[in-house]
Amino acid sequence: MSAERLVYVMGPSGAGKDSLLAYARKHVREPRIAFAHRYITRKSDGHENHVELTRDEFAARAQLGFFALEWSSHGFRYGVGVEIDAWLAAGSVVVVSGSRAHLPAALERYPQMCVVHIDAAPHVLAERLATRGRETADEIRARLARSVRWAVPDGIALTAIDNSGTLDDAGRVLVALLEGLARS
């Protein structure tokens, strides 16, 4: 398995991670790049690549070992299926949408993975979160406070993408990174 071909994309809420991943899915030309969907115990809003599961369904799949990666965040459960291991073994570059808090556990399973941090200026994050309409003003402030406290673990090579500007600008950076990994 080529764990260095696993691309773990993470970032604070409102950074535009899902928009960038959708942009990359649309614009990559390399067929060996695969985008993993997540399994999440919340309703799909149509803006991210995920399969909605009930808490019981999620727990059953976790117990059966169906997840390569799993974590809890904001009262929900998130998982990435073990199918990514087969995709990696077949030589694909596999892109997953992860969590900053879960990064240490993900690195235990995939120590050579490529870590990508998507971020945006604080005022951009606040504006996007308010527009999204999922949280109250207090919840948005709490999310922004968490993003300030996050730090890169020691020894981790990190690719940072600033998504404060246009989606095309940040999207081209992500697409170039993925296509470069696929060619290597």
Swiss-Prot record:
InterPro entries: GK/Ca_channel_bsu (IPR008145), P-loop_NTPase (IPR027417), PhnN (IPR012699). GO terms for molecular function: ATP binding; ribose 1,5-bisphosphate phosphokinase activity. Its EC number is 2.7.4.23. The keyword Repeat does not apply. Disulfide bonds: none annotated. It catalyses: alpha-D-ribose 1,5-bisphosphate + ATP = 5-phospho-alpha-D-ribose 1-diphosphate + ADP. Keywords: ATP-binding, Nucleotide-binding, Transferase. HAMAP family: PhnN (MF_00836). Belongs to the ribose 1,5-bisphosphokinase family. This is Ribose 1,5-bisphosphate phosphokinase PhnN. It comes from Burkholderia mallei (strain SAVP1).
